[in-house]
């Protein structure tokens, strides 16, 4: 099963790589892989673009996102809550997309991005509180969490060591120069005090620990994090992926980074900065709320929209169960519209198989049957993600 899952992720990332590089005109780190995937895409219609859609362009948003681009493929959105923290230090390890000496800045949003599970613990738009940043720093984590952490470097906020964060606040750290050796982890560490602090359900994607008042670091999930690990990389294009746990990479091996979003990030090369905005349990209705989650995603040149699974299973928060195909279509349109208005090129995935019961599978089948035409009507790209994750003879059965 694990081997089959990796094959599926590799196939999806190769096909998507061909789509992204085709309409930007830039090569990838592995051009032979992209060329082979491109030929396959042409023959199988895996990626379809409306004829009137032009090539992606590198946007100028007039804000910090123009300069500071994602430098990790680990997602750090807010789909969790820390109920109470009293001088708790949180630590996480991040693989980098680009190494060497770079200027870093970190972006934060004190808001919940998406609904988790039933929405009882956390839901989109829920009220949060203010909190205090007592200190923050980055460091060289070596090549393993077992290595000694070195080169601790303070991160400041308006030249201060800490910051008072109000409910709903979004803000940037000051710039900090840091030299990260090849294949070393970037460590993020900060000390917080507060209640109802938005956090990331990390789901085994990286080493996530916390320490209370100087005690030993122990496993911690969820944990609060910056929403962007940003660096002045000078990439020609920025790519963001907004979606659910399949995009976030949940239920994959610890710190293996074999899910499709990590694979495509590693293959795209230095012309691209990839920002993983996937969140476990997220629905298209969460993104359609047009909160900070979608707002920050609008800054990317290319946005991948990958929903369907939790829409079918759970539906929007406060609803009465899974959504119908028509309801999902409407939410997807509400996600597409502001992205297009912001000047982003959009790629929409269809819903992958999930070994559903008959009723839920009928919703997936109906939704997938109309999605390509919806994308053509909306002037965005369609990507047949589902066909890469199923056997053609049994399309309803997941092979991952």
Predicted regions and their residues:
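A short helix->loop->beta-strand "cap" motif at the edges of active sites that frequently abuts
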Residues: 342-346
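Sec-dependent N-terminal signal peptides
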Residues: 5-16
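Structural motif
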Residues: 187, 304-306, 347
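N-terminal secretory targeting modules
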Residues: 28-242, 247-248, 252-253
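Alpha-helical scaffolding segments of alpha/beta enzyme cores, especially the outer helices
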Residues: 327-341, 366-373
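Conserved SGNH/GDSL esterase-like catalytic core that processes O-acyl groups on lipids
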Residues: 236-241, 246-333, 355-357, 365
């Amino acid at each position: 099963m694990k081997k089959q899952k990796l094959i599926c992720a590799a196939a999806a990332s190769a096909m998507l790589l061909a789509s992204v590089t085709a309409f930007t005109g830039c090569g990838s780190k592995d051009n032979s892989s992209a060329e082979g995937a491109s030929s396959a895409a042409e023959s199988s219609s895996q990626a379809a673009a409306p004829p009137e859609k032009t090539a992606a362009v590198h946007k100028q948003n007039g804000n910090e996102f123009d300069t500071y681009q994602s430098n990790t493929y680990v997602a750090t959105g807010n789909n969790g809550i820390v109920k109470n923290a009293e001088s708790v230090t949180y630590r996480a390890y991040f693989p980098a997309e680009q190494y060497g000496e770079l200027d870093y800045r970190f972006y934060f949003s004190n808001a919940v991005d998406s609904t988790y599970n039933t929405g009882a613990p956390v839901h989109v738009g829920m009220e949060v509180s203010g909190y205090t940043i007592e200190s923050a720093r980055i460091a060289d984590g070596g090549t393993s969490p077992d290595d000694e952490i070195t080169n601790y470097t303070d991160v400041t906020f308006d030249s201060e060591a800490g910051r008072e964060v109000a409910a709903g606040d979004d803000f940037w750290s000051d710039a900090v120069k840091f030299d990260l050796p090849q294949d070393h982890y970037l460590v993020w560490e900060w000390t917080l005090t507060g209640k109802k602090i938005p956090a990331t359900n990390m789901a085994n994607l990286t080493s996530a620990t916390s320490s209370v008042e100087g005690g030993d670091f122990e496993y911690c999930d969820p944990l609060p994090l910056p929403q962007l690990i940003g660096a002045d990389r000078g990439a020609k294009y920025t790519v963001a992926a907004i979606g659910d746990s399949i995009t976030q990479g949940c239920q994959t091996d610890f710190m293996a980074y074999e899910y499709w979003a990590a694979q495509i990030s590693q293959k795209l090369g230095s012309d691209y900065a990839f920002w993983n905005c996937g969140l476990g349990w997220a629905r298209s209705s969460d993104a359609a709320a047009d909160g900070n989650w979608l707002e920050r995603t609008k800054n990317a040149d290319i946005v991948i929209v990958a929903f369907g699974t939790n829409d079918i299973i759970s539906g929007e928060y406060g609803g009465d169960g899974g959504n119908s195909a028509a309801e999902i279509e409407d939410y997807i349109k509400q996600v597409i519209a502001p992205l297009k208005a912001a000047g982003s090129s959009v790629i929409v995935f269809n819903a992958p198989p999930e070994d559903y019961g008959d009723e839920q599978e009928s919703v997936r089948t109906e939704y997938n049957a109309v999605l390509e035409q919806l994308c053509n009507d909306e002037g965005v790209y369609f990507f047949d993600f589902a066909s890469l994750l199923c056997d053609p003879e049994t399309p309803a059965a997941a092979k991952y």
